[in-house]
Every structure is written in structure tokens, then in C-alpha cells.
UniProtKB/Swiss-Prot annotation:
GO terms for cellular component: cytoplasm. Involved in the biosynthesis of isoprenoids. Catalyzes the 1,3-allylic rearrangement of the homoallylic substrate isopentenyl (IPP) to its allylic isomer, dimethylallyl diphosphate (DMAPP). Belongs to the IPP isomerase type 2 family. Substrate binds at residues 11-12, 161. FMN binds at residues 72-74, 102, 131, 192, 222, 287-288. This is Isopentenyl-diphosphate delta-isomerase. The gene is fni.
Length: 347
């Protein structure tokens, strides 16, 4: 009979395998709005040079020279730790921030903390996000941060992942706990969705807390409800549930969000990063797309993709006459009829 630790580790490895399968089979489609529902209005006289572009973003007291980071994926098993080490090496080489996957397993079984700590050893001077669930205590939040000497903490809110999970939580009283952690922790706290987007109601609730940032984790990226349905026997289907990344960005605008904003959920190109910036994001991040490329082609190819994104983003800034992110925010987008309908309904 498997021990509790072995069961937890098996679940971690199942998540990895199913996330890879999800992206390999291109199941990351959403019934909601996508970035193709908006088009960038060009500036034919940009009066700019590619050498004069500065797309760095000042967030959480840190200058991110490229407004993108490697999002939380995994950790806590031999396979997962190897992937985290590869991601940390990529992040170091590309001067990117990185988030580790949920550290719950290492908080419960401290002997597994070394795999997470290795990320800091590799990316010694990089910006790292620790990661815990919203039900964890302030003490566990501090332990997670200390484990990787993190610069910030992601608290994931994952109701739509827990409910399809046979062994998942069934009680979700999180808001007060999140605020306690955010108000007492010494590093910035980011609340992160895990693939279902964030509504105006949630933005407004978080506005009253001490959290520093919100990661919208919209539909269109890895769908953890799909992953848990594959693991489960209950067949609870949430394929059509939630808000897409683009819809969540619009919700943030309509909620007059003032927290730092991170666009995650199916980010696969520089153009999607650029549109996210136009719509108010301070940073973008990606997990599943990076994982798929890492497992299919290896770390060198992932670095090539990121290098290409940097070049492409530079060109998009020039094409719109934007020297920096402040000017990028003024770029006009042409909205599709579906996008206009969404805005009208949600006003």
C-alpha cells in the first residue's frame, strides 16, 4: 500500500503528464474571447528605432527587463524537480523571473524541500515566486518563501480544480486568510487563478485586501478541471466554465483594478504579451506552453522561443510607435463584435 507521500507524489507526476498531453493534443481552446478578437491599430510613422525601445516593467519593487516570466508548474518529485531545474536554468540564461509549483508537498514532507531549494541555487540572483494554496497558514506562507528565498508569493485559488478532484477540498473560506498573509508577510503576495479567469466581483473583493498583485490565470491555458476529470471517476465537466484571459483583462478594466496585473492563460506569442500590456497587464507569464516545448524539444529550443519573443515584442513596440510600456498602454485596439458584446453585457 502506498504511503501518503507516495500518493501525493504520484498525483504531482500525473498532473505533469496530463498537462503535457493537454497541450500536445491542443485542447487549450476556449469558448470565450481570445486575443484574435482584437486587432492592433498600426502607426505607419513611428519615428522610432528598434534600439530605442524599453519594454521593461517595474513591478513589486523590481525591474523586469522583459515583461514575461515562467509560470508555476510543478515540484516535489524526482521528475518534477528535474523539470524545475531546467526551467531555472532557462530563467537564469534569459534573465526571467520564475514561479515554482505548489510547495504544499514540501511543507508536509520537509525532506522534499531540497528540490524546490535547488531552483534558488541555480537562479541565485533571479526573482522567484513561492507558491501555496489559499488554505495555508501564515506560518506555512513564511516557510514556503524561506524555502526558495522567494521575492514574492503566489497564492493559488483553485476551487474549480479541487471540486472535480476525488480527494479535493470541499470548503473554501479563503479571503480573510489571504488578507492576513498579505498584510503580514514581508514579500509581495499575488493571488493567482489556475485556468478559469477572474471576474469583476473577485477583483473588487481583492481590492479591499493587502495583496500586491492579481494573476488572472484565464481559460485558454492549462485546464486543471480537465486534468482532474481525467484522474477522477466523477466526470464533473467544466470545459466551458470560466473567463478567458482576454475576458479577465476586460473585467479588470471594468472593475477599475489598481493591483499589479499579470496575464496568464494560454500566452503563446509576443503579440499576446503585447495585447495584454495594452489592456493593462504589467506582466505576462506562461506554464503549459513552456512545458510542452521543454518536453518536446528541450531547453535550448525553449530559449530560442523566448529570444524570438523578445525580438518580436521590440518590433511590435516600433510598429505602434511605443517607446515604453506607458506609451504601449495608449495603443488602440480594434474590437470584434463578440468583444463589444461582452463589454456591453458586463458593464
Amino acid at each position: 500500500m502506498k504511503t501518503e507521500k507516495e500518493i501525493h507524489q504520484h498525483r504531482k507526476d500525473e498532473h505533469l503528464s496530463l498537462a503535457y498531453k493537454y497541450w500536445r493534443e491542443e485542447k487549450n481552446q476556449t469558448s470565450g474571447l481570445t486575443f484574435s478578437d482584437s486587432r492592433i491599430i498600426p502607426n505607419s510613422l513611428p519615428e522610432l528605432s528598434t534600439k530605442k525601445i524599453n519594454f521593461s516593467s517595474e513591478v513589486f519593487g523590481q525591474n523586469f527587463e522583459f515583461p514575461f516570466y515562467i509560470e508555476a508548474m510543478t515540484g516535489g518529485t524526482e521528475r518534477a524537480d528535474k523539470i524545475n531545474a531546467q526551467l531555472a536554468e532557462i530563467a537564469k540564461n534569459q534573465h526571467l523571473a520564475m514561479a515554482v509549483g505548489s510547495q504544499s508537498i514540501a511543507l508536509k514532507f520537509p525532506e522534499l524541500a531540497a528540490g524546490f531549494s535547488e531552483v534558488r541555487k541555480i537562479h541565485s540572483s533571479g526573482f522567484l515566486f513561492a507558491n501555496i494554496g489559499a488554505g495555508h497558514s501564515l506560518e506555512n506562507a513564511k516557510r514556503a518563501v524561506d524555502m526558495i528565498e522567494a521575492n514574492a508569493l503566489e497564492i493559488h485559488v483553485n476551487t474549480a480544480q479541487e471540486l472535480p478532484m476525488d480527494e479535493g477540498d470541499r470548503e473554501f473560506y479563503w479571503l480573510e486568510n489571504i488578507n492576513e498573509i498579505a498584510s503580514q508577510l514581508e514579500v509581495p503576495v499575488v493571488v493567482k487563478e489556475v485556468g478559469f479567469g477572474i471576474s469583476q466581483k473577485t477583483f473588487k473583493a481583492l481590492a479591499k485586501t493587502s495583496v500586491s498583485g492579481i494573476n488572472i490565470g484565464g481559460a485558454g491555458g492549462t485546464n486543471f478541471a480537465w486534468i482532474e476529470r481525467k484522474r477522477s471517476k466523477n466526470g464533473f465537466n467544466l470545459d466551458e466554465f470560466g473567463l478567458s484571459t482576454l475576458e479577465s483583462l476586460l473585467e479588470a478594466k471594468m472593475a477599475d483594478n489598481r493591483k499589479s496585473l499579470i496575464a496568464t492563460g494560454g500566452i503563446t506569442s509576443a503579440q499576446e504579451i503585447f495585447k495584454s500590456l495594452i489592456l493593462g497587464a504589467d506582466l505576462s507569464s506562461s506554464a503549459g506552453f513552456i512545458l510542452k516545448n521543454l518536453m518536446q524539444t528541450g531547453p535550448e529550443k525553449v530559449e530560442e522561443v523566448i529570444e524570438q519573443w523578445k525580438q518580436d515584442l521590440n518590433k511590435l513596440f516600433v510598429l505602434t510607435g511605443s517607446k515604453n510600456i506607458e506609451e504601449c498602454r495608449k495603443v488602440e485596439l480594434l474590437y470584434s463584435i463578440n468583444m463589444l458584446n461582452f463589454i456591453q453585457q458586463r458593464k
